[in-house]
Structure formats: C-alpha cells, structure tokens
C-alpha cells in the first residue's frame, strides 16, 4: 500500500495553476491541483477517461459540458464524463485532487500538465 497525505506541502504558484502528480501508473493518475484566487484552467477535456474531482479546500467555479458555471467548495465530488469539456476558476485559494483511469501521459513532466490539451485531465 502507498500512503500519500493530501493536506501537506501544498504549493501555490503566483504565475498560474500548479499540478502535482501524486501517483501515476499504467492504471491511473491522482493529481493535486492548487490555484490562487482568480487563477484559471482553460477549457480542456480528458478524451479517454472520466475525470473525478474532489475539492479539498477553498471555493471555485467549475463548468462542464453544459457550460453552466457552478460554485463548489470543500468536500464536493465532481464527475466529468470522458471527453467532457470543463473549466476552472478559483474564487479563493483552491485545492482539489483529480483522478483519471489509465495514464497515456505518464511520461509527461508535471509542468506540462497545464500547457497542452492532451496532458490535461
């Protein structure tokens, strides 16, 4: 068993959202995202996996394939279908973990997770 704390060592980057791959293997990925107030993640999708989001701290605006913006906070689970486009905007410092099955981008550097559509969940 592997043990990973979800409440320690959060890194925020004033230049933009930060993605920290907590666990990556052939079966899936768990990625910790941190955004400072008003930072955004542009529209993207995960073409080959559902994307499950668990909000750990803060509040943010998430929009899915229906383009409806929803304000969500800690202890909320969001479920995006494979290929469903989604966006994120932090209303305050926002921390969430995203889970995907499979890991087609397992060799991608963490910083690339926020640079291309293929690498983004």
Identify the residue ranges that each predicted region occupies.
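A short, N-terminal "cap"/entry segment at the start of jelly-roll beta-barrel domains
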Residues: 1-29, 42, 63, 112-121
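Short histidine-centered beta-strand/loop micro-motifs
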Residues: 21-24, 33, 41-46, 64, ...
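Short beta-strand segments in beta-sandwich/barrel cores
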Residues: 40-42, 58-63, 77-78
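Glycine- and acidic-residue-biased ligand/ion/polar-headgroup-sensing regions
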Residues: 48-61, 65
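A cytosolic small-molecule/anion-sensing beta-strand core signal
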Residues: 56-57, 73-74, 92
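Short acidic-glycine-tyrosine-enriched beta hairpin
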Residues: 66-82
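Ligand-binding loop in jelly-roll beta-barrel domains
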Residues: 82-106
